[in-house]
Design a protein with these regions (language model features):
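Short, polar/charged alpha-helical segment
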Residues: 28, 32-55, 224
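A ligand-binding cleft/hinge motif common to bilobed small-molecule-binding domains
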Residues: 88-92, 212-230
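Extracytoplasmic ligand-binding site segments that recognize negatively charged/polar headgroups
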Residues: 32-39, 61-62, 77-210
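Mature extracytoplasmic/periplasmic domains
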Residues: 241, 250-305
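A bilobed periplasmic-binding-protein/Venus flytrap-type ligand-binding module shared by bacterial periplasmic
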Residues: 130-137, 172, 244-255, 274
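An extracytoplasmic/periplasmic, membrane-proximal ligand-sensing/linker region
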Residues: 181-183, 283-326
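Short beta-strand->loop
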Residues: 99-106, 119-123, 145, 213, ...
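Periplasmic-binding protein-like
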Residues: 127-128, 186-189, 195-196, 227-251, ...
Length: 326
């Protein structure tokens, strides 16, 4: 009987170890990347890390964070890692002690302002928001101010900051900009601009001719143009807002080990070149530029104060919902 009990206990231990090993090989990722890009990212990560399986939940940043907040409230957060649009969302999570610091992460070659000084999140790329317009549009916009002119009446579409993290970051950044301010958004509303669910819907509307002008992230417009879509893109004269699509490990991660591997991959030369090949501007300059950005062309960025944006973004979302509807 003693031998049987010992054998049974050993069997249970072996099963427990096997279950632990299987669990350690599954990584849960929540991301706001477009579906095709999320698939490419995960497949490249898995190729570099054999044996690791990845479960993905993909949605707009705002929807994703709403889901995550509900999981926190229930005491059952699911993701191990996040790859979402903007640093402001990460700052809010960090403030609530939801992020796990990774001090050993290799940040060589990254701009100092692209990652958290305490190394809880790390920018993976630079995504700017500018103006897209259909090739057949009557006007050729050059500035944000153009979009509130009578010639653009009822012709502009933009992503809702209630869904898109990049749009939310731009909204509060513009509100803080003395040259534009919140008046820019009231001007858009008065000029008949409509807000749609996300950047993908903006691209569809502009490329399809439903609306001639759109507020849109750079890579979507320029990649579509490269594929033959009748769309043009301009970096407005006043400058553009930019998000860094940061990656982070949750403090509640069930699989932090593979979470660190995921961060390592995103920041690696291979991960950065993958971002470039998908049409993004990588966080590491050494990874090169996407085809749509020639050498020597510099992008003017709007001044950004992440902490100031973080402090006002929820109030700005409420103001936007009141102005444009939820």
């Amino acid at each position: 009987m003693k031998n049987f009990v010992t054998t049974l206990a050993a069997g249970h231990l072996a099963l427990a170890l096997l279950a632990g090993a299987a669990h350690a090989g599954t990584l849960t990722l929540y991301t706001s990347q477009p579906e095709a890009d999320a698939t490419k990212t995960v497949e490249a990560f898995k190729a570099a890390n054999p044996g690791v399986e990845v479960e993905i939940f993909r949605s707009g940043t705002s929807d994703l964070l709403t889901k995550l907040a509900a999981e926190f409230a229930a005491g059952a957060p699911q993701p191990d890692v996040l790859l979402i649009a903007d640093a402001v969302s990460m700052e809010l999570l960090k403030k609530d002690n939801r992020l796990l610091a990774y001090p050993e992460a290799d940040v060589e070659g990254l701009a100092p302002d692209s990652y958290d000084a305490e190394r809880t999140y790390f920018g993976s790329k630079l995504i700017t928001t500018g103006i897209a317009y259909n090739s057949a549009a009557a006007e050729k916009p050059e500035s944000w101010a153009d979009l509130v002119k009578p010639a653009y009446k009822d012709g502009v579409v933009m992503p809702s900051p209630l869904y898109s993290g990049a749009a939310a970051y731009m909204m509060s950044g513009v509100a803080l900009d003395p040259a534009l301010g919140w008046e820019f958004y009231t001007g858009l509303k008065d000029n008949g601009t409509i807000a749609v669910r996300g950047n993908g819907a903006v691209l569809k509307a502009v490329a399809g001719g439903e609306k001639p002008y759109g507020v849109l992230v750079d890579f979507m417009a320029l990649n579509a143009k490269a594929q033959g879509s009748p769309i043009e893109f301009v970096f407005p004269a006043e400058g553009v807002s930019a998000v860094t699509e940061p990656v982070a490990i949750l403090s509640s991660a069930k699989n932090p080990e593979d979470g660190r591997r995921f961060v390592d991959f995103i920041l690696s030369d291979a991960g950065q070149k993958l971002a470039r090949d998908m049409g993004y501007l990588p966080a590491k300059a050494s990874a090169g530029r996407p085809d749509w950005l020639p050498e020597g062309v510099e992008i003017k960025l709007m001044p950004a104060d992440i902490k100031a944006v973080t402090e006002r973004i929820e109030a700005d979302k409420a103001g936007f919902a009141e102005l444009f509807g939820g």
